[in-house]
Each structure stands twice: as C-alpha cells, then as structure tokens.
Swiss-Prot record:
Species for this entry: Arabidopsis thaliana (Mouse-ear cress)
Catalytic site positions: H121 (tele-amp-histidine intermediate)
Binding site for substrate: N52, Q108, H123
The protein's name: Bifunctional bis(5'-adenosyl)-triphosphatase/adenylylsulfatase FHIT
GO molecular function, one term: bis(5'-adenosyl)-triphosphatase activity
UniProt keywords, alphabetically: Hydrolase, Nucleotide-binding, Transferase
HIT domain segment(s): 27-134
C-alpha cells in the first residue's frame, strides 16, 4: 500500500523520481481507450498526466488515475491525494512554462456533468487574460469538446484531430519540465 503524507513536505521519494516513463509500460488506459505512452509526460505509481487530443487552449492537459475508475467517489483515499497532488504539480509547471497567470482545474463527474469518457480525469488549463470573452465560457467549451470527443472517438478508427507525433512532441516538451 502506498503511504502518502498529505500534510508532509514530500510524498515518497519513489513517487518524486518516477516521473521518467518506464520502458515496461506499453500503454495507459483512458476509459475504453489505450493511450500511447508517448502522449504521457508525467506519471506516479497512481496517476498520470497526458496531452489532450483536442485541447481548448495551449497546454490543456488531463490528469488521470492509473486504475480505471469511472467516478470520483470510487477513488481510494491514496488515489484521490495522488491525483490532486499530481494536478497541482502539473498545473504549476505548465502555468510557468506557458507564462499563464491562472489555472482552471475541472472534473466532469458523471454523464449529467458532461463526462463522456468513463474514467476520472482532471482538466488542467493554464489561463491568460482574454483567452475567453467571459471567464465561465470555458465550462461550456469543455462540455462541447467532451461531446465532440465522444462522437469522434471510435475504437475502430484512428484519431483524426491531432497526430500521435504532434501529441508526442508536446508531451516530450512537457516531460522535460519534470526530469529528476
């Protein structure tokens, strides 16, 4: 069992340095979809961060638990802590890297909340002034992108929005932010 120190300064040194992608991990699950490990730029034993197939803004990424968990309340305490600590670290690095001034973190938990992939995930969007005319428009845009993603992703078809290479290049750039 993973022993997380939520109030401590560190989690475990094994988590801190497990950022480098393991060559033994051939893929990650995102609901029913397999994610190419080249799209993943940060991972802990319980969570991973990946670039987005259809980003709303530059650096719009997702943080997910490694275990396929459909709803937020189904996460264990350790998974919940690790997921949010991962989101905090990823958000901080990407906000700085993209010279953003704020972050939007969002979870759509369940179909009526706009969740279309049955796997808990946190959207992280570094924000800049004027990126949306009205700040709350980002939530409508998230809902719309989730609906489009559900319609366009088909297990029997290739993803057409961004190429694997384009996503791998972005992930590689972000991965360098987390090297030990």
């Amino acid at each position: 069992m993973l022993n997380l120190q939520v109030t401590g300064k560190t989690i475990l040194s094994s988590i801190r340095c497990q950022r480098k992608m393991s060559s033994t991990c051939s893929s990650y699950a995102f609901g029913p979809y397999k994610i190419d490990p080249r799209e993943v730029f940060y991972a802990t034993p319980l969570s991973y961060a990946m670039v987005n197939l259809r980003p709303l803004l530059p650096a719009h990424v997702l943080v997910c638990p490694r275990r396929l968990v459909p709803r937020f309340t189904d996460l264990t305490a350790d998974e919940t802590s690790d997921l949010w600590l991962t989101a905090q670290k990823v958000g901080s690095k990407l906000e700085t890297f993209h010279n953003a001034s704020s972050l939007t973190l969002a979870i759509q938990d369940g179909p009526q909340a706009g969740q279309t992939v049955p796997h808990v995930h946190i959207h992280i969007l570094p924000r800049k002034g004027g990126d949306f005319e009205k700040n709350d428009e980002i939530y409508d845009a998230l809902d719309e992108k989730e609906k489009e993603l559900k319609q366009k992703l088909d297990l029997d078809k290739d993803r057409v929005d961004r190429s694997i290479q384009e996503m791998a290049d972005e992930a590689s750039q972000y991965r360098s932010l987390f090297d030990c």
